UniProtKB/Swiss-Prot annotation:
It catalyses: Endonucleolytic cleavage to 5'-phosphomonoester. Pfam families: RNase_HII. InterPro entries: RNase_HII (IPR022898), RNase_HII/HIII (IPR001352), RNase_HII/HIII_dom (IPR024567), RNaseH-like_sf (IPR012337), RNaseH_sf (IPR036397). One of its GO terms (biological process) is DNA replication, removal of RNA primer. Its main location: cytoplasm. One of its GO terms (cellular component) is cytoplasm. It comes from the Bacteria. Endonuclease that specifically degrades the RNA of RNA-DNA hybrids. It is found in: Cytoplasm. This is Ribonuclease HII.
Length: 196
């Protein structure tokens, strides 16, 4: 008998100037609830890490997908976000061993999926599975930024996670761009054009 699995899907990293956009997909296990799921943006980094480990341990299945800076520059950030979400659902389905019945997507549009999907504005505050997906995406992306900081400490990625802050702008001005910067984003493009 096939179970009805509903997965939540959310992304992290649309706004940064560097790195991949990352999506998470999670099917929660009603027999193994996780307390305290909220939108990852409202949680401290320590709390997010704790909940991430709980999700890894207790969720029925989870998946991660991403779109690289090169893909973002090629197809634009919106399409890259949809691609990352689709990849996250595909990763979840591979781990689950079957496709979920439906995907609940945070936001106002859905990626092209081979299953039913529903967009829910502010879904990360309304649906626990979307909140869990938000946490998976955010922690995964933050870890990528910390690893990128090890390679390029001069940019301060571990502090601002690639977002367009004054410190990031100052580093761009001083050091130029690295290979992981999104060249289609205006501040990075201005550095490349010498007009920053």
């Amino acid at each position: 008998m096939n179970m009805i699995w509903v997965c939540g899907v959310d992304e992290a990293g649309r706004g940064p100037l560097v790195g991949a956009v990352v999506a998470g997909a999670v099917v929660l296990d009603p027999e193994n609830p996780i307390e305290g799921l909220k939108d990852s943006k409202k949680l401290s980094a320590v709390r997010r890490e704790f909940l991430y480990e709980q999700i890894m341990e207790k969720a029925k299945a989870w998946g991660v997908g991403e779109a690289s800076p090169t893909e973002i520059d090629s197809i634009n950030i919106l399409q890259a976000t949809m691609l990352a979400m689709r990849r996250a659902v595909e990763d979840l389905a591979a781990r689950l061993g079957e496709w979920p019945s439906k995907a609940l997507i945070d936001g106002n549009r859905c990626p092209e999926l081979s299953i039913a999907a529903e967009a829910i504005v502010k879904g990360d505050t309304k649906e626990p599975a979307i909140s869990a997906a938000s946490i998976v995406a955010k922690v995964t992306r933050d870890r990528q930024m910390i690893a990128l900081h090890e390679q390029h400490p001069q940019y301060g990625f571990s502090q601002h996670m690639g977002y367009p802050t004054e410190a990031h702008f100052a580093a761009l001005k001083q050091y130029g761009v690295c290979t992981e910067h999104r060249k289609s984003f205006a501040p990075v493009r201005r550095v490349l054009e010498g007009s920053f």
